[in-house]
């Protein structure tokens, strides 16, 4: 609730009896006098010299030129490379600490100009620019060694459905019916007319699907635009608050100091001093802390596409690539529609069997009839003639692999092949385990005082003091008088000698007074014994990178890290020189007749043929594309000193100056009449809180801090940044002979086998009844040319063997030079050259007219000293003083857990290929592939002789 009214002032008590004369100890020396008011502030010193600009990023290292590849399709001009980022500008040095303000003296000398800050450190090295665009293709080099077989490309698209299969073979003849009774000899019948043609044959089985060839690779697409820079990620959560510190030991009791008196009215400013002479140039300040690197600039806008350049000379035709792997098996074609069944004809009268006519040509197979009911089993027929040998059946399943033969005597080593290219460096392995902590080193010498730290934020308010055990008596407030005018502060009196210490009061301890001013720093005490190792503090933020230290002595080799993952299989080495022939082995036993062998691998390429004739001159190419934007030019040389400047024109008249400072105090005026003593007015309302006082001058450097205790284990570090690009790997060691490979996967279906040889003719058997129709015979010699048949369905594409690549002809004569292309855009201007020395100063122009002096204000009469006002509200806590020198470093804490492994650094340049290893022993041959598709039906053989007449048929129905 609101404060109640003040009670009446109590009657003062009787004076106490004087106590016995005490002889107290001599009083402590008085507090030093308060600092006088701050003198007028000198003019600000000239600004410190800006740090030199950081070096521009060096251009990226040009990549090694790869072997000339085959002439590819003309690519779309790429966008211009992003220039390297310019180094960040170093920070200006931190100004030296400001000296303590001296007592107010007579007219203040103007302050010397501030020291120039030391030039900032060189900015970090710029990010190397992106790799430049490759130059125009050079002339065709000599034919390189055959490259390693490329990895299998993706499966080609499913080929179209193969052509319809060939008509199926004539089905086997049905079993012979029962032997009928021989009929009586009938009359010679009239030869009947030929019956109607049989119904159309059923569609043959679906042909095997054709092997679709791999489609040609598509043209490379145009490079996409660079993606927009992603938004900045959200700020991570704040770390957990550190543990609350232990309370410090209670400080020594401070000297008894009276409460500070009321703040005097600030006196009028003294007259401005004359401009002092320019001070000597100060020594350079300490090196500024390097600033953090700025954000990486976004990608530049895409340049305009250049016009087509002049076509270069046509390069030699590249070697024909190896055939790609067979595409996936196509889906089987749809079965053909069965033909419509013919209308059965009326049954004719059974005629007498006629004489057998000549064998007609085999008609197309009829449609499959409906399943008939099985007839009664007939008597066994006579043994038929030996049939013609059928086609060889499909290959049987692969037998169990034989036991591995003993390892042969190693042949003489082949000639050392040419050094292969450096293999690519493997990905950066995970960090090895942390080594054991080293022994604690000897304490180093005290470091130099650190830079003046930026004043920290105001600390939290201290804990309030504990109240006394017994509260003191509250005095009765007196009636408040009228507040008089505030007078000028009187001159400070001479401090009197300290009085004898009075007896200790009987009352309870009062509330602790406000904290006294900080005393002068005492002499540095001797180093105390090291305290116990404290708990390790939370790891602080990473400081700015310090300057590079001197290279240390080479340390002992650490323990070997864990073995890295097995690298990718290297490219096969060049084929070695053929070794000398080995000794002839013993003759082996004759082997059994083997199956027809699979198609052999294509032979080695033949000798290089003679060079072909020179090709005709190529056509005139279109104008070439606009050249790339030129790289920034080198830094210009330092310019020479310029000529002295001409005499400047007289300056314009200066502005009217501000009113001059107040003049000296005039003689004191006659004393005015004494006014009547006014009655005390009511107590005024409490005024608003005064604004916080100005920040006081920085305090003197604090004493050196105590030796810090080792901090606690820090939390796991954040994932490291990508490691630097790995160095080129060393040349590989000659590999050991490879182990025997595991059993390979089943091979792909082999090509169609060649037709087997014609079997020998069978022996003539006894003439029996006509046997069932045998399988189609092997194609006989070609008969006479028949009439031209209707065009058949398109066959599946054949696969011929790859021909040898002919030698590349010499490059054709260069075409006529094309029209000059348009002028490329102007390159970026080079870095600004170093500033030349300043030329001699020109003559000083005439001084402008001085403005009129402002009127001097009259000095007022000195007012009467008013009553002491109420104590103002406690001001804000002042800013922290200058940071004291850094204490001796604490004992190193235990090593925190290793941070998460950073992402793998960029892939290093390929290391040199090792010498080719020895040929390993051949693995176990894979199982035999499935049989190939059936070969095409051969041409019809010649018509055979007429067969013997068959037996008479059974009698017809009555």
UniProtKB/Swiss-Prot annotation:
Disulfide bonds: none
Tissue: Forms the fibrils of tendon, ligaments and bones. In bones, the fibrils are mineralized with calcium hydroxyapatite.
Primary localization: secreted
Subunit: Trimers of one alpha 2(I) and two alpha 1(I) chains.
GO cellular component terms, A-Z: collagen trimer; extracellular region
Descriptive protein name: Collagen alpha-1(I) chain
Compositionally biased spans, kind Basic and acidic residues: 50-64, 859-873
PTM notes: Prolines at the third position of the tripeptide repeating unit (G-X-Y) are hydroxylated in some or all of the chains.
Task of the protein: Type I collagen is a member of group I collagen (fibrillar forming collagen).
InterPro entries: Collagen (IPR008160), Collagen_Structural_Proteins (IPR050938)
UniProt keyword annotations, A-Z: Calcium, Collagen, Extinct organism protein, Extracellular matrix, Hydroxylation, Phosphoprotein, Repeat, Secreted
Subcellular location: Secreted; Secreted, Extracellular space; Secreted, Extracellular space, Extracellular matrix
Biased composition regions of type Gly residues, renumbered to the chain: 294-303
Misc. comment: These protein fragments were extracted from fossils. The tryptic peptides required multiple purification steps in order to eliminate contaminants and to increase the concentration of peptidic material.
Compositional bias of kind Low complexity: 100-116, 139-152, 216-232, 304-335, 347-373, 382-401, 557-571, 584-614, 640-656, 685-694, 704-728, 892-925
Entry's family note: Belongs to the fibrillar collagen family.
Modified residues (Phosphoserine): 92, 560
Biased composition (Pro residues): 154-166, 769-779, 808-823, 943-958
Segments of this protein annotated with the region Disordered: 1-958
């Amino acid at each position: 609730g609101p404060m109640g009214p003040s009670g009446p002032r109590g009657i003062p008590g009787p004076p106490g009896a004087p106590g016995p004369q005490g002889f107290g100890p001599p009083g402590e020396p008085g507090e030093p006098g308060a600092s006088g008011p701050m003198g007028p502030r000198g003019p600000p010193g000239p600004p410190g010299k800006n740090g030199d600009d950081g070096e521009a990023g060096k251009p990226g290292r040009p990549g090694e030129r790869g072997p000339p590849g085959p002439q590819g399709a003309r690519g779309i001009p790429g966008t211009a490379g992003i220039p390297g980022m310019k180094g960040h500008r170093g920070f200006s040095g931190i100004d030296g600490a400001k000296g303590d303000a001296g007592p107010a003296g007579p007219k203040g000398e103007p302050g010397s100009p501030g020291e120039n800050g030391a030039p900032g450190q060189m900015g970090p090295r710029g990010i190397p620019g992106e790799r430049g665009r490759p130059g125009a293709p050079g002339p065709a080099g000599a034919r390189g060694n055959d490259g390693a077989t490329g990895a299998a490309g993706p499966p080609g698209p499913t080929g179209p459905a193969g052509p319809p299969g060939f008509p199926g073979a004539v089905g086997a003849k049905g079993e012979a019916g029962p032997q009928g009774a021989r009929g009586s000899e009938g009359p010679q019948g009239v030869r009947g007319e030929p019956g109607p043609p049989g119904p159309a044959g059923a569609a043959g089985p679906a042909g095997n699907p054709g092997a679709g060839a791999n489609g040609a690779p598509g043209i490379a697409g145009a490079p996409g635009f660079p993606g927009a820079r992603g938004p900045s990620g959200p700020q991570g959560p704040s770390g957990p608050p550190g543990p609350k510190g232990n309370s410090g030991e209670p400080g020594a009791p401070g000297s008894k100091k009276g409460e500070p008196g009321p703040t005097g009215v600030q006196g009028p400013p003294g007259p401005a001093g004359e401009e002092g002479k320019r001070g000597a140039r100060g020594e350079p300040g300490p090196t500024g802390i390097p600033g953090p690197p700025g954000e990486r600039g976004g990608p530049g806008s895409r340049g305009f596409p250049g016009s087509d350049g002049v076509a270069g000379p046509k390069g030699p035709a590249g070697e024909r690539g190896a055939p790609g792997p067979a595409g996936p098996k196509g889906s089987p074609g749809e079965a053909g529609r069965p033909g419509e069944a013919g209308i059965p004809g009326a049954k004719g009268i059974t005629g007498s069997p006629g004489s057998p006519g000549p064998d007609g040509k085999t008609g197309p197979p009829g449609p499959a009839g409906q399943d008939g009911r099985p007839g009664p089993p007939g008597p066994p027929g006579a043994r038929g003639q030996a049939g013609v040998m059928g086609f060889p059946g499909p290959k049987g399943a692969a037998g169990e692999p034989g036991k591995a033969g003993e390892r042969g005597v190693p042949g003489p080593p082949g000639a050392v092949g040419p050094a292969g290219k450096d293999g690519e460096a493997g990905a950066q392995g995970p960090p090895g385990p942390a080594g054991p902590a080293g022994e604690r080193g000897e304490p180093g010498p005290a470091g130099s005082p650190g830079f003046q730290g930026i004043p920290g934020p105001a600390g939290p308010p201290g804990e309030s003091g504990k109240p006394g055990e017994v509260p003191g008596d509250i005095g009765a407030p007196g009636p408040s008088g009228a507040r008089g005018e505030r007078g000028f502060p009187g001159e400070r009196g001479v401090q009197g000698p300290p009085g004898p210490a009075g007896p200790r009061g009987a009352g309870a301890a009062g509330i602790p007074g406000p904290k006294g001013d900080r005393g002068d720093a005492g002499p540095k005490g001797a180093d105390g014994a090291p305290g116990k190792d404290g708990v390790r503090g939370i790891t602080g933020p990473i400081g700015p990178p310090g300057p590079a230290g001197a290279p240390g002595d080479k340390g002992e080799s650490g323990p070997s890290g864990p073995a890295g993952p097995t690298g990718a299989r290297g490219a096969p080495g060049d084929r070695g020189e053929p070794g000398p022939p080995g000794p002839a082995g013993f003759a082996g036993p004759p082997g059994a007749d083997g199956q027809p062998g699979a198609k052999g691998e294509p032979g080695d390429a033949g000798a290089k043929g003679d060079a072909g004739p020179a090709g005709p001159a190529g056509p005139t190419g279109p104008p070439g594309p606009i050249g790339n934007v030129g790289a920034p030019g080198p830094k210009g040389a330092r310019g020479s000193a310029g000529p002295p400047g001409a005499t400047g024109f007289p300056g314009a008249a200066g502005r009217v100056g501000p009113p001059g400072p107040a003049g000296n105090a005039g003689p004191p005026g006659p004393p005015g009449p004494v006014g009547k003593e006014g009655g005390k007015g009511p107590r005024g309302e409490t005024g608003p809180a005064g604004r916080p006082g100005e920040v006081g001058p920085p305090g003197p450097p604090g004493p050196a801090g105590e030796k810090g205790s080792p901090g606690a284990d820090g939390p796991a570090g954040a994932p490291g940044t990508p490691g630097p690009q790995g160095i080129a790997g060393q040349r590989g060691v000659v590999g050991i002979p490879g182990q025997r490979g595991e059993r390979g996967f089943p091979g792909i279906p082999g090509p169609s086998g060649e037709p087997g040889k014609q079997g020998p003719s069978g022996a003539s058997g006894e003439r029996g009844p006509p046997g069932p129709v045998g399988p189609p015979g092997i194609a006989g010699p070609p008969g006479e040319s028949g009439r031209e048949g209707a065009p058949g369905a398109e066959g599946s594409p054949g696969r011929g063997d790859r021909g040898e690549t002919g030698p590349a002809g010499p490059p054709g004569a260069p075409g006529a030079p094309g029209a000059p292309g348009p002028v490329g855009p102007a390159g970026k201007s080079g870095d600004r050259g170093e500033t030349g020395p300043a030329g001699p100063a020109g003559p000083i122009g005439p001084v402008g007219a001085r403005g009129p002096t402002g009127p001097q204000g009259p000095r007022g009469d000195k007012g009467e000293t008013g009553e002491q006002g109420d104590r103002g509200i406690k001001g804000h806590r002042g800013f922290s003083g200058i940071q004291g020198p850094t204490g001796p470093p604490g004992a190193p804490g235990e090593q925190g857990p290793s941070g998460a492994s950073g992402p793998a650094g960029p892939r290093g340049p390929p290391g040199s290929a090792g010498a080719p290893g020895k040929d390993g022993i051949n693995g176990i041959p894979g199982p035999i592939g499935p049989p190939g598709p059936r070969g095409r039906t051969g041409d019809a053989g010649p018509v055979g002789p007429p067969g013997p007449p068959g037996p008479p048929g059974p009698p017809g129905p009555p």
